[in-house]
C-alpha cells in the first residue's frame, strides 16, 4: 500500500525516478531521449504496470504552514501493509539502482516476468531495487529476490542476470507466487490434503506396493523418487543443457543397470505409477525413500510440475494415477479460473 507523509519543506527537491505524473501517481510518461524512461513507458503501455526505482511514488504541495512555507505530501511504497492489517514491526531498507545500465538490465527482467505472467497475476505496480534488507533481519529476504506487498511487487538483485537466468528467475518467482496464492485458499488446501492425508511422511516400504521404487533406490545413484521428478517429459528449464540422464548406474561400481533408453523409461513409468497410487509425484525433500512430509511440501511439488508441464504433458505423465489427477484437477481449476493461467 502507499504511505502518506506530510512534511514542511523550504524548496522543491527533485524525486529520483522522474516520469511519474502527479495527476496520476502511477502513470508513466514518455521521454524518447531517456532510454530508461522510454522503456518504463513502453512497459506501462504494454502491460499497464508502472515500474519504480525507489519507494517514493509522488510528492506534491498541499498547502502552506503558518510561516508561509510549503507543506508537502509524500506518497511512498510501504511493505508493512497487508490486505486487512498494518504492522510497523519491520523496517525495510532499500539500496537503489544507481546507473542507467543497471536500471535497463532490471527492466529487461521486469519485461520477461510480465511476459510470462498471466494478466490476473500481474501486480498493480513493480519496484526494482539493487538490494533489500530489513530490520530485524529476515532469512526469507536473503533467500528470495522479491517481496510482494499489498499493491507493489518489489524485485531486488535482478539487474545483473544473463538471459537464461532472467528466464529461470522470473519462472521461479511465478512458481512461488502461485504457490502462495494456493496456500492462501484454505478450502482448496483442505481438499488437497484430504486426498493423501493418511500417507504423508511414510516410507515407501511401509506404504507397500512400491517394489520397483525400493529396488532401484537401493542400487542406483540416480533413481530416486526425487530425481524421478525431473525425468521425461519433465524438464524444469526448456532447452537446458542439464539433459535428462538415462544412465542408471550402480551405487558402488557405477556400472550401467539398464540396457537402453526404453528400459530406463519403463522403470521410470513403473515408479511413477507406484508412488502415484498414493497421490504423490515425488518423495520427501530430505529423503527420497519417504513420501512428502506434509501437504504444503506436496502442494509445492504439484504447483511446479503443473506450471512446467502444462495440462497435456501432466496428463501424459500422471493420467493413470487416480489420486494424483484428483489433486491436479483441484489445483488446475483454481489456477485457470481464479489466477487466469493457461496450462
How would you label these PLM feature ranges?
Residues 241-243, 249-343:
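A cross-kingdom marker for long, charged
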Residues 10-108, 317-343:
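Acidic/polar, low-complexity intrinsically disordered N-terminal segments immediately downstream
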Residues 5-9:
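C-terminal motif of bacterial Sec signal peptides marking the signal peptidase cleavage site
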Residues 192-282:
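Post-HExxH zinc-binding segment in Zn-dependent metallohydrolases
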Residues 152-208:
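Active-site recognition of the HExxH zinc-binding catalytic motif
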Residues 95-152:
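Auxiliary, metal-adjacent structural segments of Zn-dependent hydrolase domains
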Residues 115, 175-179, 183, 336, ...:
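Sec-exported extracytoplasmic/periplasmic mature domains
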Residues 1-3:
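Sec-dependent signal peptide recognition
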